[in-house]
Amino acid sequence: MHENERYAAGLQVRRAVLGNAHVDRSLAARTPFTEEFQEFITRTAWGTVWTREGLPRHTRSLLTLAMMVARGHDEEFKLHVRAARNNGVSADEIKEVLLQAAIYCGVPAANHAFALAAPILAEQAAEGGANAAD
């Protein structure tokens, strides 16, 4: 796949997973300093990895949540809680990931992740958003 095609495929997946509003904000916030990085993320993370057929997006979202907990990347974790819901991940599945993380990443990391995820899930349920019925 040509670089431009990979970018276009990545942008499509990035929008589907993260939502148009987030992607539009990220692209609008580009500067000459960050523009190449935004293109790199879209082309490589989204256009190369997230477009692969080896794992469904649902599974990729679960893995991403676990890795964000393990690395302590709070803002990305919150972003990917929303993204996981866009990929059909239920609140119960997110809870299971966090319980698993408690064992392998430590109780404090999981406790913090529960505190970050809870308001997002509650907000989505109140708005009738992604998978609100679970």
What are these regions (language model features)?
Residues L62-L65, V69-K95:
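Mid-chain, well-packed structural core segment of small domains
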Residues I103-Y104, L121:
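Short Asp/Glu-rich motifs
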Residues I41-A45, L62-M67, V97-A102, A113:
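Short alpha-helical scaffolding segments that buttress acidic/His motifs in well-ordered protein cores
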